[in-house]
């Protein structure tokens, strides 16, 4: 994928980004053979899906971003490749958390923090400015399990599919941006 062709990425260090993607793909291939971390076929499409939110939302004022159910790193790892914000990834699966820790070391990501625990069991040291999650669960249960990390200023950015409209019933303050079948939901 040629990232330099996208206007919304023009202000980022794309050479460094592409080097980190190469490391990511090599590590994912290695870990996937043993641990079966993901069944995704087109990694490039999923990387683009992870960073497309930068076309719709400005992350510059956020100090701490929490990603819930980080799995193989989509979307938070790729945002951390591009941004300087602190990313806190919550992944209770030991194999996936080990992959994320290895990736952090290999890519020298000082802005990435991995927690091998469920977010609802986390005893808060910080409040997240932004909480992200990609297709983990319905919106209302997600809001509930994140109560230790959020305050009245926390913004949720969710990568969802077409079901998002039903999930948002009785929720008022949100925006949805679309890219193909993906719905990027921003809850304020």
UniProtKB/Swiss-Prot annotation:
Picking any one GO molecular function of the record gives: rRNA (guanine-N7-)-methyltransferase activity
Q: From the UniProt record, list the reaction(s) this protein catalyses.
A: guanosine(527) in 16S rRNA + S-adenosyl-L-methionine = N(7)-methylguanosine(527) in 16S rRNA + S-adenosyl-L-homocysteine
Query: Major place of localization?
Result: cytoplasm
Tell me the first and last residues of the signal peptide.
Answer: none
Q: Which UniProt keywords apply?
A: Cytoplasm, Methyltransferase, rRNA processing, S-adenosyl-L-methionine, Transferase
Q: Where in the cell is it found?
A: Cytoplasm
Is rRNA processing tagged as a keyword? yes
Q: Which PANTHER family does this entry report, sorted A to Z?
A: S-ADENOSYL-L-METHIONINE-DEPENDENT METHYLTRANSFERASES SUPERFAMILY PROTEIN
Question: What is the recorded function of this protein according to its Swiss-Prot or TrEMBL entry?
Answer: Specifically methylates the N7 position of guanine in position 527 of 16S rRNA.
Record's protein name: Ribosomal RNA small subunit methyltransferase G
